[in-house]
Amino acid sequence: MTEFAPLLVADGVVAGYLPGVDILKGVDLTLGRGELVGIIGPNGAGKSTLVKAIFGLVRVGGGVVTLEGEDISNLAAHELVARGVGYVPQRDNVFPTLTAEENLRMGLYLEPEAWDERIASVLELFPHLAGRSSQRAGLMSGGERQMLAMSRALMMNPRVILLDEPSAGLSPANQDLVFDTVRQICDSGVSIIMVEQNARRCLQICDRGYVLDQG
């Protein structure tokens, strides 16, 4: 059962890519433990900017982001990973010249000794990767690359995963597979914030949803 005690909170977040040009203008968001939260809205509304701001890729110029009450605003990516926050971008989310196994090992750069334990749990969710360990990521289909990217994030043993449009550019069948897998990941105990253009499918699998419009 989902526990709605706050795990991650964005409180009045103001952020943008250029000084004085704010894309987000005071956004509030709460993620509970074991919860899957969707963020939908039109193109250019600031959805991707929000998850990038949470992950420290876009500077937070106002408001605060907290994880279990700790201010994590503007922390570096490696500091957030160490605190259990993972991020899967929409594009360039795998290393195309590396094999699937090498991509997964990149998710363990902080804890390389945990390979045996983590790979076993990841392959329970992504069994098809077991036979693809030596395949270069760049030769995989779009759906397979997305699964590999999510798998690598799970190798970090995160408490929170930020997903930026995981279904973008995929066939309807692969979109369904991605959405089903996202729900399974959440049901395994990982809290998820998912930005998504496919509002209907997003809201079907999410516990709650936010609509973002013009920041």
Where on the chain are the PLM-derived regions?
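A short, flexible loop at the N-terminus of ABC-type nucleotide-binding domains that lies
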Residues: 2-10, 14-26, 33, 57-59, ...
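ABC-type ATPase nucleotide-binding domains, specifically the catalytic core motifs of the NBD
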Residues: 18-19, 37, 59, 75-77, ...
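The feature captures the beta-strand-to-loop junction immediately N-terminal to the Walker
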Residues: 40-42
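Conserved ABC transporter NBD signature motif
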Residues: 63-71, 83, 115-124
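Conserved ABC ATPase signature
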Residues: 136-140, 144
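ABC ATPase C-loop
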Residues: 153-154
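Conserved catalytic motifs of ABC-family nucleotide-binding domains
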Residues: 157
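Walker B catalytic motif
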Residues: 165-166
